[in-house]
From Swiss-Prot:
It comes from the Eukaryota. It catalyses: S-ubiquitinyl-[E2 ubiquitin-conjugating enzyme]-L-cysteine + [acceptor protein]-L-lysine = [E2 ubiquitin-conjugating enzyme]-L-cysteine + N(6)-ubiquitinyl-[acceptor protein]-L-lysine. Its EC number is 2.3.2.27. It holds the Pfam family zf-C3HC4_4. It is an enzyme of class 2 (transferase). This is Zinc finger protein RFP. A zinc finger (RING-type) spans 16-57. It comes from Mus musculus. GO terms for molecular function: DNA binding; identical protein binding; transcription coactivator activity; ubiquitin protein ligase activity; ubiquitin-protein transferase activity; zinc ion binding.
């Protein structure tokens, strides 16, 4: 490449597209372009959101930029090379202003071209000096290295941006699918309710017709009777006002006709109509209660799913610590299952091991933050799970209660669920626990338990005071039958459509060997 072309390329790479001058404090944007800090300040003003790149016009939701120190260094080198560029015919450098000798050398300490007299002077004595051409080639190589680095970073940024755009498109596609599902489900629900509405309204129309047909004849008869009575009353009123001779004429017949009129029986609504209306009212009441229960259950289920999902965001990988296991507890090779055996293993009685009760602790330890894991208890008749402080007594008997550093729930005799508070709290569960979720919020002092199968909350220990690291806690004993099955720590990846934990905002200490 000709030197002029190289110079032009260097000039373009180190020039701000806004002020068209050498970069001063270049700042890299998310789109990969570089702009002077002052130029960005003029372009963006006081705006903090929805700012755009002055070069490509890509819009960013928030104001975000990073100093590009590599480009700043390259710019300084290019500016320095321009000031040191050979001048005059033949491409020779100028002369030293002090000694009037050609500038053929370069002092690395002072970063300036010097002449041979300067090289021998006291000012540059002991300095590292290179031929000017060699120094220029070195600088060009440095510039090229930095340009290569910047181009690699730019390409990487472009790939990251493409990955972000792809992720955004995929996530938006998922939300669109969920949106379509919601619209479809509610349309089906709407059509179903509309059909029930039409049926009920049609039944009301039938009732209206039955009422009209049943009562209309009686009403017509009453109307005729009323008309007849009106005529008779008019005759009697007229007779009452007649002179004596006329009044006495046909008086017997007139009074006889009046006496034959009987008082009507009390009105009685046809019983079959009353029964039909009562049945319909019961249907409407059932409809009202059903819709109310449906709405409440839907809201409750949505809240349950949300609460459990929020806990599952903090899922951690829990394993069993064999150094803590009671000798009758058999651990699986992957340290995720534990079962009880009547035959005790010959294990060292190290300080960490429980020696009286069939207990084992999990790893890791937790010293802050939020953490969630799940345990498959199956049909076991007796078990205890939860958390405990790492400092709990391992030797001899100890009551599993908060004052002793334990926060756990337990099943006794296959039917009695208890929260091991002090005193204990009975848990009247509607369905047996098969899979239990444990959520530890260390900083808030809370330990919560969930029925994962039913997606509902079971119990929460509040206002707990943790004195040091906290660990998962497991205890079980043998009762025969199905209860001989192991407790299983469930792998969290992919459970119920959940893929791994999004983020564990806390701290833990690994304790497994």
């Amino acid at each position: 490449m000709a030197s002029g072309s190289v110079a032009e390329c260097l000039q373009q790479e180190t020039t701000c597209p806004v002020c068209l001058q050498y970069f001063v404090e270049p700042m890299m944007l998310d789109c990969g372009h570089n702009i002077c800090c002052a130029c960005l300040a003029r372009c963006w003003g006081a705006a903090e959101t929805n700012v755009s790149c002055p070069q490509c016009r890509e819009t960013f939701p928030q104001r975000h930029m990073r100093p590009n120190r590599h480009l700043a260094n390259v710019t300084q080198l290019v500016k320095q090379l321009r000031t040191e560029r050979p001048s005059g015919p033949g491409g020779e450098m100028g002369v030293c202003e002090k000694h009037r000798e050609p500038l053929k050398l370069y002092c690395e300490q002072d970063q300036m071209p010097i002449c041979v007299v300067c090289d021998r002077s006291r000012e540059h004595r002991g300095h590292s000096v290179l031929p000017l051409e060699e120094a220029v080639e070195g600088f060009k190589e440095q510039i090229q290295n930095r340009l290569d680095h910047l181009r690699r970073v730019k390409d990487l940024k472009k790939r990251r941006r493409a990955q972000g755009e792809q992720a955004r498109a995929e996530l938006l596609s998922l939300t669109q699918m969920e949106r379509e599902k919601i619209v479809w489900e509610f349309e089906q629900l709407y059509h179903s309710l509309k059909e029930h509405e039409y049926r009920l309204l049609a039944r009301l129309e039938e009732l209206d017709l039955a009422i009209y047909n049943s009562i209309n004849g009686a009403i017509t008869q009453f109307s005729c009777n009323i008309s007849h009575l009106s005529g008779l009353i008019a005759q009697l009123e007229e007779k009452q006002q007649q002179p004596t001779r006329e009044l006495l004429q046909d008086i017997g017949d007139t009074l006889s006709r009046a006496e034959r009129i009987r008082i009507p029986e009390p009105w009685i609504t046809p019983p079959d109509l009353q029964e039909k209306i009562h049945i319909f009212a019961q249907k409407c009441l059932f409809l009202t209660e059903s819709l109310k229960q449906f709405t409440e259950k839907m809201q409750s289920d949505m809240e349950k799913i949300q609460e459990l999902r929020e806990a599952q965001l903090y899922s951690v990988d829990v394993t069993l610590d064999p150094d803590t296991a009671y000798p009758s507890l058999i651990l699986s090779d992957n340290l995720r299952q534990v079962r009880y055996s009547y035959l005790q293993q010959d294990l060292p009685d190290n300080p960490e091991r429980f020696n009286l009760f069939p207990c084992v602790l999990g790893s890791p330890c937790f010293i802050a933050g939020r953490h969630y894991w799940e345990v498959e208890v199956g049909d076991k008749a007796k078990w205890t799970i939860g958390v405990c402080e790492d400092s709990v007594c391992r030797k001899g008997g100890v009551t599993s209660a908060p004052q002793n550093g334990f926060w756990a729930v337990s099943l006794w005799y296959g039917k009695e669920y208890w929260a091991l508070t002090s005193p204990m709290t009975a848990l009247p569960l509607r369905t047996p626990l098969q899979r239990v979720g444990i959520f530890l919020d260390y900083d808030a002092g809370e330990v919560s338990f969930y029925n994962v199968t039913e997606r509902c909350h079971t119990f929460t220990f509040s206002h707990a005071t943790f004195c040091g690291p906290v660990r998962p806690y497991f205890s079980l004993s043998y009762s025969g039958g199905k209860s001989a099955a192991p407790l299983i720590i469930c792998p969290m990846s992919g459970i119920d459509g959940f893929s791994g934990h999004v983020g564990n905002h806390g701290h833990s200490m690994e304790t497994s060997p």
